[in-house]
């Protein structure tokens, strides 16, 4: 039996009498949302009980309708639908020389939106063993990989995904390097250069490799011990270096966890999250070539 299959079988046994809460924020993700709903329900079926909390905002596609249908058909699902006035975030200036993807304006918004599900858990006094935070716009969630995370024998606080995508040149890359902070480098400022370099340095993580200790990671899906993060909130951490104005909102949770002595964060190589379909990447590349 491979290490992956062994972890999967142990994970099944570990969680059969435990509870989990899935949390997500979504916007304009109708295309991938349908099959990801099925995967969330599959993962949830391994647990004694599961709850889904989703905050949607400002979608222009069929996301709102899909979510409302899901909530009607599954009483484990809570959906909050909204159209927010987002001009207030535009009042936060983006300083010259900083990337808009890594700026205070964007991360302030992301932190505010993500705090909604943590505040919902607190205000409704929800209890659980685990909280799984997931991006429902990803192309594919490896269900078996998620369950394998619970089979690890060493103590852990957070387990993040092995996320991957293809570059414009179709080269495999680790996708979520903005949220990735290597163990021991948490006091070193990030830069656009290191974020980009890590996409390829971390590209070849594969099944059956040992879990990798990091300071921070997300990867589109991460598992947290409920008791450790139920009272935490996302916030903005200045970076102010190398084109990166602030750190990713996920880093703020790990910063608080470390302060409390809960810094055992790992990437599970088996818990693969595919961010985009290769065919869509090829299509966009062809489209770009035609429109030159």
Predicted regions and their residues:
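N-proximal low-complexity "stem/linker" segments adjacent to membrane-targeting elements
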Residues: 1-42
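Cell-envelope/extracellular polymer assembly enzymes that use nucleotide-activated donors
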Residues: 19-21, 51, 252
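Active-site-proximal specificity loops/subdomain of glycosyltransferases
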Residues: 70-128
């Amino acid at each position: 039996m491979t290490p992956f299959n062994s972890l999967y079988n142990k994970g099944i046994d570990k969680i059969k009498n435990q509870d989990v809460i899935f949390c997500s924020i979504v916007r304009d993700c109708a295309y991938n949302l349908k099959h990801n709903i099925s995967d969330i329900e599959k993962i949830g079926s391994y647990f004694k009980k599961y709850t889904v909390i989703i905050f949607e905002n400002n979608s222009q596609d069929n996301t709102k309708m899909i979510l409302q249908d899901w909530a009607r058909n599954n009483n484990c699902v809570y959906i909050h639908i909204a159209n927010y006035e987002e001009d207030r975030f535009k009042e936060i200036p983006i300083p010259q020389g900083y990337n808009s993807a890594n700026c205070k304006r964007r991360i302030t918004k992301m932190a505010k939106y993500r705090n909604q599900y943590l505040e919902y858990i607190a205000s409704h006094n929800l209890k659980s063993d685990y909280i799984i935070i997931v991006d429902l716009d990803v192309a594919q969630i490896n269900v078996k990989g998620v369950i394998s995370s619970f089979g690890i024998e060493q103590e852990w606080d957070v387990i993040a995904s092995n996320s991957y995508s293809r570059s414009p040149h179709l080269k495999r890359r680790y996708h979520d390097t903005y949220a990735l902070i290597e163990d021991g480098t948490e006091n070193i400022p990030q830069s656009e250069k290191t974020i980009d370099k890590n996409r390829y340095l971390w590209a070849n993580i594969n099944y059956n490799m040992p879990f990798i200790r990091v300071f921070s990671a997300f990867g589109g899906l991460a598992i947290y011990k409920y008791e450790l993060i139920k009272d935490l909130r996302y916030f903005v951490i200045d970076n102010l270096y190398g084109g990166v104005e602030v750190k990713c909102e996920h880093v703020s949770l790990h910063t608080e966890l470390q302060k409390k002595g809960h810094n055992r964060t790992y990437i599970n190589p088996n818990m693969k999250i595919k961010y985009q379909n290769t065919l869509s990447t090829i299509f966009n590349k062809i489209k770009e070539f035609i429109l030159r």
